[in-house]
């Protein structure tokens, strides 16, 4: 009985912490003058708490494991909702594809540029002029 209560406590604690960060993000988003999704702010709060080791990762790990395990199932309602607007998407197929391609290219460029800034130039082992 004690082991099952411990497992229930771990899952309950994980989901309470994840949802606390989510609702804190929603609350902060409602106070901001610009529109930022509360879920994004909540994720950033959770990230900061984990990165600064204020919140031990083992406390949220069981809940994260469950959410990641069933992530595909969570996208089913979104897919059904998109299919309701299939005619509209078909009419706007060109602009949607172009915007997706451009945004993907912009993301690639920003990530490569920021990676270059953060990591600098590092010599590859075996490259001419590098030390072994």
UniProtKB/Swiss-Prot annotation:
Belongs to the UPF0299 family. It comes from Citrobacter koseri (strain ATCC BAA-895 / CDC 4225-83 / SGSC4696). It comes from the Bacteria. Pfam families: LrgA (PF03788). The chain crosses the membrane at residues 7-27, 31-51, 63-83, 93-113. The keyword Membrane applies. One of its GO terms (cellular component) is plasma membrane. Its main location: membrane. HAMAP family: UPF0299 (MF_01144). Keywords: Cell inner membrane, Cell membrane, Membrane, Transmembrane, Transmembrane helix. It is found in: Cell inner membrane. This is UPF0299 membrane protein CKO_00648. PANTHER family: HOLIN-LIKE PROTEIN CIDA-RELATED, UPF0299 MEMBRANE PROTEIN YOHJ. It is a multi-pass membrane protein. NCBIfam families: PRK01821.1.
């Amino acid at each position: 009985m004690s082991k099952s209560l411990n497992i229930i406590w771990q899952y309950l604690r994980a989901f309470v912490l994840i949802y606390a960060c989510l609702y804190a993000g929603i609350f902060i988003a409602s106070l901001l003058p610009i529109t930022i999704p509360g879920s994004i702010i909540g994720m950033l709060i959770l990230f900061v708490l984990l990165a600064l080791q204020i919140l031990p990762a083992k406390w949220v790990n069981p809940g994260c494991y469950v959410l990641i395990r069933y992530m595909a199932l969570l996208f089913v309602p979104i897919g059904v909702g998109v299919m309701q607007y299939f005619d509209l998407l078909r009419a706007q197929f060109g602009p949607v594809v172009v915007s997706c391609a451009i945004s993907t290219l912009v993301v690639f460029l920003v990530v490569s540029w920021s990676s270059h800034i953060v990591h600098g130039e590092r010599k590859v082992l075996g490259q001419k002029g590098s030390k072994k």
